[in-house]
């Protein structure tokens, strides 16, 4: 089971922590997190949202859709979205979805 947590870090920055298996069973929670980020943006003039994925063990289509939705919302509302501390599974899923990286992700363990 996965988890999503939205944390207001102050200084116009929000961190969204993803951990565990971010799959279809999390779709409602992920949509809620996008709405929560938007509400915080409306209150405090958000300039940056960071998605921390160090604890992600699986990033399925719903997780990738969440990242796209959040990035799109940021483009429309004027805040930057970046990814940090990506686990191997998260990096591979994001890379496979078409986000470019300077370095290719390592191959999955055998």
Task: Cite the ranges covered by each PLM segment.
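STAS-like cytosolic regulatory interaction modules
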Residues: 1-58, 62-110
């Amino acid at each position: 089971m996965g988890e999503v947590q939205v944390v207001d870090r102050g200084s116009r920055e929000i961190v969204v922590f993803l951990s565990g298996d971010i799959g279809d069973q999390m779709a409602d929670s992920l949509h809620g997190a996008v709405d929560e980020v938007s509400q915080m943006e409306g209150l405090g003039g958000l300039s940056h949202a960071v998605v921390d994925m160090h604890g992600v063990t699986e990033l399925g289509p719903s997780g990738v859709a969440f990242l796209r939705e959040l990035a799109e919302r940021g483009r429309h509302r004027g805040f930057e979205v970046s990814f940090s501390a990506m686990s191997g599974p998260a990096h591979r899923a994001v890379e496979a979805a078409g986000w470019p990286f300077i370095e290719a992700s390592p191959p999955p363990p055998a």
